[in-house]
A protein has these predicted regions:
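A structural boundary/capping signal
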Residues: 1-122
Length: 122
């Protein structure tokens, strides 16, 4: 698991460095990273990890805590159906509904934040 965490951290740092260098200024998706980038980032990270010999599953969930029926989606990866790999969870850092989740890289078992989301795809 330590190797996965190191690879995920390296991948996240590369995105952060590109963002700081202005590489995403004209990009409609990544210019606001990590906000609204979880699906695309999970896809890219999955390929990166696969290239390193680590097979992952894409997971998408929706938080349906609002009474108006609208929800908030979030995506991450899983290894062996039990280890979460999430490098965009900090997009929720200023939202108390989502526990002010501020982890830019999370690799581990299910936690309170990820349990908020009803999983749709696995």
């Amino acid at each position: 698991m330590k190797n996965i965490e190191q690879l995920a951290t390296k991948f996240r740092k590369a995105i952060d460095m590109a963002l700081e260098a202005g590489e995403f200024a004209g990009d409609s998706i990544y210019r606001r990273f990590p906000r609204a980038c979880c699906g695309d980032t999970s896809d890219l990270l999955a390929q990166y990890l696969l290239d390193k010999g680590i097979k992952t599953d894409y997971v998408c969930g929706t938080y349906r805590g609002k009474t108006d029926g609208n929800g908030q989606s979030h995506a991450w990866l899983m290894v062996d159906k039990c280890i979460i790999i999430d490098i965009t969870g900090d997009q929720f850092s200023s939202r108390s509904t989502f526990l002010n989740y501020n982890k830019s890289v999370y690799v581990g078992q299910g936690d309170d934040f990820h349990r908020l989301f009803e999983v749709e795809d696995r």
